[in-house]
């Protein structure tokens, strides 16, 4: 049984065999297999191009503030209690108020 399987498929196993000299043998494929490989290579290149574009457009993610552990824990508790959207809304409102007061106080000092 294995011999029949081997005889039927051994040609496919010859793909890119490396000899001890380091020279690669030519791939042995049918025209249908060659078309499938060409399509697969095209798709891999498209995927690689997409990854390169993502990499090139990426930015370093630097946190705006560093939270203390106890503050982060309180925020997690609030998120669990009120939900992420409500927590975001409340924190953004508070931060805007604090920063607008700080900016106006700095303007008055000058």
Swiss-Prot record:
Keywords: Cell membrane, Chaperone, Membrane, Transmembrane, Transmembrane helix. The keyword Membrane applies. Residues 23-31, 82-88 are extracellular. The keyword Signal does not apply. It is a multi-pass membrane protein. It is found in: Cell membrane. The chain crosses the membrane at residues 8-22, 32-55, 67-81, 89-102. GO terms for cellular component: plasma membrane. Coiled coil: none annotated. Residues 1-7, 56-66, 103-110 are cytoplasmic. As a fusion partner, can be used for high-level production of other membrane proteins in their native conformations, including many eukaryotic proteins that have previously been intractable to bacterial expression. Chaperone that facilitates the production and integration of integral membrane proteins into the bacterial lipid bilayer. Monomer. This is Protein mistic.
